[in-house]
Amino acid sequence: MRIITGNQPPKADTHYSVYNVDGKYINSIGMRPGNIRLTDLRWEQVMDWNLGWNIGLFNDLLTADINLYSKQTSDLFTNDPKIPSTSGFTSLPTENGGDMKNQGYEINLSLNRVKIAGDLSATFNLTFANNRNTITAMDPIRLAAINGTGVNVPDNGEYMTRVLLNNPFGALYGLRYKGVYAYSYDHFDQAQAEGATCPVARDANGNVIYGPDGTPMQMYYNYTQTKYAFKGGDAIYEDINHDGSIDHYDVVYLGSSLPKLTGGFGFRLYYKGWSLNAQFNYRYGNKIANVARMNAEKMHGSENQSTAVNYRWRKEGDGADGSHVLPRALYGAGYNWLGSDRFVEDGSFLRLNYLQFSYGFESKLIRRIGLSRLSLYVSGENLFCLTRYSGVDPEVGYGGMGVTTDNATTPRAKSYTLGLTATF
């Protein structure tokens, strides 16, 4: 079924000219414009469809709910778009900034109370879903305001915000981290002899680039402005265009914050009066910027640091043998913690969300004490999580224009419950 609905502008009175009483002029009350009248502002239009099936097989022993959906939003509202200050204002309240499409599916499968052997029976459930969003159109001025001028240089602790047409929100953009320079530029000959890394520019084939004077071209951070010369112990970032400068030309796509698959599964086993209920949830295929680890390894300020920094670069030649070392400590200086794939991790996980073990007493036993039902149970929540993510909890919220970042938020608590249920 296809339906067109809409949303009214999020801020009121934007189609009127508003004047505010402010100050005085020649001993009279002064007034000034309070807004810019938006004569072209339109309702946001949403056109969506949903196709679903409810299936039951073998007398509903196996059931399935399948849903496919698509949602196309036109004249999408974007808040506080920047405008030239010559207008007397720095931004508009809102505007119709673009179009976006969301589409995906959700499938729920259930196997209901199937007999396994004797008094043992079970139920099973499985859910998996996928949602993809795509920016199909956006006002060029708004797009430029989000993405910058195109010459924005990545900085320490920052991942670039990018919105590209026909791409999803939540994409991660940054540099590619390639390790640590074992030697400084002045030790080029020694580095060459050992086959070790040194901050010199190389072409696409890995050959050293030499300048007009016959000396190797040194690697810099943002050569045209900052002109910071990389040294031994500094982080190596891939020079995508092989110009000897790490800058905006070297920013690449690092992955999406949106998972490829989300869902859960579980089972419940029954044996006489006993039952075991286990429920899992999972997420697969999303990327997380582990900013907590970044801050714990940056060695840039006076904050507490991870024990991993004990294995940092300290002297010329450290790491030349291929051993893993972190970049050197540089208090308040350097560019060793730029937003790169060094801190981007796979956020996939499998979590045992709930587990309950219970026993229901037989009716003939409990009727003697005036009860119609009595059961005892013990349960636990968030009992374990299987993941390769190095942070405290991979279940980080995602969605919106920004990237998914983990700033050491408080993880979900693990809990246990012992209970008794009685019915009179």
What are these regions (language model features)?
Residues 94-101, 144-159, 163-169, 254-264, ...:
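C-terminal extracellular loops and terminal segments
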Residues 1-165, 339-424:
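Extracellular/periplasmic, surface-exposed regions of secreted and cell-surface proteins
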Residues 6-21, 142-146, 176, 180, ...:
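Membrane-proximal, glycine/serine-rich, low-complexity loop/turn segments characteristic
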Residues 229-232, 283-375, 379-380:
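Extracytoplasmic gating/loop element in the C-terminal half of outer-membrane beta-barrel translocons
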Residues 114-255, 297:
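Conserved small-residue
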Residues 125, 249, 259-273, 353-358:
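Conserved SET/PR-domain catalytic core that frames the SAM/AdoMet-binding pocket
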Residues 73-74, 255-257, 285-287, 394-396:
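A short local loop/turn or secondary-structure capping micro-motif enriched for an aromatic residue
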Residues 31-32, 243-248, 332-341:
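Short glycine/proline-rich turn/loop motifs
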